[in-house]
Amino acid sequence: MGNMLKGEGPGPLPPLLQQYVELRDRYPDYLLLFQVGDFYECFGEDAERLARALGLVLTHKTSKDFTTPMAGIPIRAFDAYAERLLKMGFRLAVADQVEPAEEAEGLVRREVTQLLTPGTLTQEALLPREANYLAAIATGDGWGLAFLDVSTGEFKGTLLKSKSALYDELFRHRPAEVLLAPELRENEAFVAEFRKRFPVMLSEAPFEPQGEGPLALRRAQGALLAYARATQGGALSVRPFRLYDPGAFVRLPEASLKALEVFEPLRGQDTLFGVLDETRTAPGRRLLQAWLRHPLLERGPLEARLDRVERFVREGALREGVRRLLFRLADLERLATRLELSRASPRDLAALRRSLEILPELKGLLGEEVGLPDLSGLLEELRAALVEDPPLKVSEGGLIREGYDPDLDALRRAHAEGVAYFLDLEAREKERTGIPTLKVGYNAVFGYYLEVTRPYYEKVPQEYRPVQTLKDRQRYTLPEMKERERELYRLEALIKRREEEVFLALRERARKEAEALREAARILAELDVYAALAEVAVRHGYTRPRFGERLRIRAGRHPVVERRTAFVPNDLEMAHELVLVTGPNMAGKSTFLRQTALIALLAQIGSFVPAEEAELPLFDGIYTRIGASDDLAGGKSTFMVEMEEVALVLKEATERSLVLLDEVGRGTSSLDGVAIATALAEALHERRCYTLFATHYFELTALALPRLKNLHVAAKEEEGGLVFYHQVLPGPASKSYGVEVAEMAGLPKEVVERARALLSAMAARREGALEEVLERLLALDPDRLTPLEALRFLHELKALALGLPLGSMKG
């Protein structure tokens, strides 16, 4: 916009618009919301942008010589509109009036009081319940990736070796906003690829190194702190930086998180997180997400988590009591941050008081071993100082209890006496003047006044000074009324100032307990997750898993699918084996694979699992190729994505990994597909992974591998068509039932019948060809063949087996 504003007219900008342009030019990357009375307004091109984004009516600001477009939103609805704008990708600069209009000498002074971006929010009304990460990425000695949640102060990062590992961590944390180092911003190919994968706001900041560790990571830390300080007006509440290693947790690549629908659904709305989220607090919800992002590798911490969940499973009354109390808690973690930033409102302190009142009850249920900090002193202070239902803003007044502050009480008494004067005045003047309808009133324009109706105008004393004439009444004032009124205004200003002083002292008292509040929030979040997992376990019949070398699941179920449909449980037993799962489409092979992985994942966050009995190894990674994450929009074919994900499996999977493969090789010719699937099966068998491989390639079921096991999903042809039993049974499937599934899908009858005829003919030809191949092999004397003749003979046999013309396989 520069120093110009889109509009019409020959004259200079009016003072209000000059002020708008000056503030707008300081924040060129932001949409400036400029307070004018009870509205936040935009002018010029920004008004057009705002109107388009929110569907507002575009009006015009008109002065003597200048007209410009104008659009605005009511201040009372700011939170709702701001949330929408942030989701649309706007950065918002909020310019408030910082002095009362009646006290301004000329134009009301305005200043930008808030800079709002998706990744730097602290306002409770605008924040999601989930973690709200700002991320920064830099390069150097690897990929430096750091995260900051400004609302909680969480500050962490890691150094990654590859771009794929970077993308995995970003997908795992799902930041709301990302800062890219200059070398990445200038790389157009990287930015284009990044935007396709992560539709989040990309922002800029100086990447000056800060902290300790590798350079790339220090640059990322510096960028986060610089950007956060800029948007927070220099104030920041950040915990010490925590370096974490993704390798210290179960490896869950992006493809696995997607295929297993851990956080985001492939279809519909159901996810694993949604199934598990019976938490009662926002910190508990965020902790459960963190556990799912980073499952544990070590048995000790897992058993400790399971012990706590089991206690809540066994003690139903305790579980219900704890969950009932937790439901009343405020978000203490974020409240502590607002205290440290000096942004906590009177209602925040009231929410803190209600939360602290719950802590003794929780201690009574759980005992002192729960380890909650002693915050009784702060609770007593808040109880003594704060009214039951304080206003949102300090400026609204009436938030400090009577009896808490002697100076404030004295001012209030003096003010009450002043108000009493006006109440007494009405009775006195009625008696003195003999005007029965006389009354004392007040409005913002004239202040206090005496009102007399028309029939009594003749009785109005001479000292009454008229201030307003209405249709059937007149309003007057007296010199002593104005003097008393001025004294009331003075007392109101003093009361307001003193209340603010008392509130700030109270907030400072609470701020000193911010770390204790964070510790309480951490303990309560863990309790919340344990109780939530126990609630899920009891409600849906989960069992405590055991850890060992073999994988044994009895009557296992898919935790998400069973919520929406009747579910057939299945058993599985394996140990460092390759398990081939065959059967028709729609029979449940993919569901069986996914439920096995989800049971393993649940066990390694410390949850009970959906099964009658479960013994599981401690997996170091869960790898999938289930066809859910094809990148067609990114220009990659299904087959290319499939091969990339398989390549990752072969690169990373170990004998302690769980590998799920579904129909690998189907994106190319059947010959290529069989060859690739066979080679992959052999490689994973050799690596001793725990592998579940669903396939239509029946050739794989006959592989001569010592640790290969065949399972199939049962189906049967009956008079009404194909029936799926969804039972997983030993041995390979007898046929694929492809034509029958096509008929169930609604293909026209003539197409289905033609397919059956073709299938019969091809099967007959193939059987005849195989017989001919066998006959020719039996008649062959290999000792009498030259090498060239042997090669030609093999080509002919292959052509016969495939039903191709002889000679077509040469060259």
Swiss-Prot record:
Keyword DNA repair: yes
Ligand binding (ATP): 583-590
UniProt name for this protein: DNA mismatch repair protein MutS
GO BP, sorted A to Z: mismatch repair
General function of this protein: This protein is involved in the repair of mismatches in DNA. It is possible that it carries out the mismatch recognition step. This protein has a weak ATPase activity.
A Gene Ontology molecular function term of the record: mismatched DNA binding
HAMAP family given in the database record: MutS
Pfam families according to UniProt: MutS_I, MutS_II, MutS_III, MutS_IV, MutS_V
SMART domains to which the protein is assigned, alphabetical: MUTSac, MUTSd
Family of the protein in this entry: Belongs to the DNA mismatch repair MutS family.
Lineage: Bacteria, Thermotogati, Deinococcota, Deinococci, Thermales
NCBIfam families: mutS1, PRK05399.1
InterPro entries: DNA_mismatch_repair_MutS, DNA_mismatch_repair_MutS-lik_N, DNA_mismatch_repair_MutS/MSH, DNA_mismatch_repair_MutS_C, DNA_mismatch_repair_MutS_clamp, DNA_mismatch_repair_MutS_core, DNA_mismatch_repair_MutS_N, DNA_mismatch_repair_MutS_sf
Keywords: ATP-binding, DNA damage, DNA repair, DNA-binding, Nucleotide-binding
